[in-house]
């Protein structure tokens, strides 16, 4: 795991490139636990409790102070673009391509190394004291139409299930939709089972993202079981072919 900075930390703070930033107020650099709790309380009442304020654009801090990932527990991730070795090759390539395209928030993506035995969402949530609603799962669904197989990567909050029989089936325009077998999912994605992620999926697949994942942070797979990726909803929405779908997660 990426070394801790030392001392108990109720939340994680994020670095971002200077060019993207608006200088934070001095008070934000010396947050007390009460100030952090107030910051977290801004999110309550929303569907996932993880969405950023809706007024204006989200900005990123110049130092380790202003951005908090609610519900991250004891994990302490680091900038993903500086640790591409912790990502599966297609994931590293896709994240790098986003940054090269000028998607500013791509540089805010974070990664953390974990024990592969803790990769499953419920196990990881329990082990690190995370909020289950922070995690978003990527589920592969397939169906056929006139002999053509159609595949969708569906991203939903871990507190919900993908509506395969209605929403996904309608989007794919197939008579029957079902989960893809593990062996085929691993082979076609180039990722490990338990680490499959929307970042870097093949361009021929549909990429359906529940609207609840398009705001706030998500903990998602890195393509490997030995690490996890943290991205904002802006990053997910900027992925090639991404479709934001209301009601995908139920």
Report the location of each language-model feature.
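Intrinsic-disorder-associated, low-complexity terminal segments enriched in Asp/Asn/His/Tyr and depleted
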Residues: 39-43, 49, 60
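Extended, low-hydrophobicity, polar/charged segments
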Residues: 57-60, 64-250
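Leucine-biased recognition of intrinsically disordered, low-complexity hydrophobic segments
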Residues: 21, 26-29, 46, 50
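Short hydrophobic alpha-helical segments enriched in small aliphatic residues
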Residues: 14-16, 35, 41-44, 56
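Intrinsic disorder/low-complexity segments
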Residues: 9-11, 53-55
């Amino acid at each position: 795991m990426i070394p801790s900075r030392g001392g108990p930390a109720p939340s994680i703070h994020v670095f971002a490139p200077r060019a993207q930033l608006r200088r934070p107020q001095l008070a934000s650099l010396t947050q007390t636990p009460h100030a952090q709790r107030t910051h977290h309380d801004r999110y309550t009442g929303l569907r996932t409790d993880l969405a950023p304020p809706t007024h204006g654009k989200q900005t990123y801090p110049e130092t380790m102070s202003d951005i908090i990932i609610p519900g991250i527990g004891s994990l302490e991730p680091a900038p993903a673009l500086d640790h591409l070795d912790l990502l599966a090759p297609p994931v590293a390539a896709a994240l790098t391509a986003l940054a090269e395209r000028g998607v500013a928030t791509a540089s805010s993506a974070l990664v953390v190394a974990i024990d592969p035995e803790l990769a499953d969402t419920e196990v990881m949530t329990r082990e690190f004291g995370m909020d289950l609603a922070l995690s978003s799962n990527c589920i592969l669904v397939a169906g056929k139409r006139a002999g053509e197989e159609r595949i969708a990567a569906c991203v939903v909050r871990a507190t919900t299930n993908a509506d395969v029989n209605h929403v996904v089936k309608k989007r794919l325009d197939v008579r029957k939709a079902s989960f893809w077998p593990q062996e085929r999912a691993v082979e076609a994605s180039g990722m490990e089972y338990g680490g499959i992620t929307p970042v870097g999926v093949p361009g021929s697949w549909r990429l359906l993202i529940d609207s609840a994942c398009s705001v706030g942070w998500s903990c998602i797979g890195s393509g490997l079981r030995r690490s996890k990726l943290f991205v904002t909803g802006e990053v997910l929405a900027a992925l090639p072919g991404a479709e934001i779908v209301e009601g995908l997660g139920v």
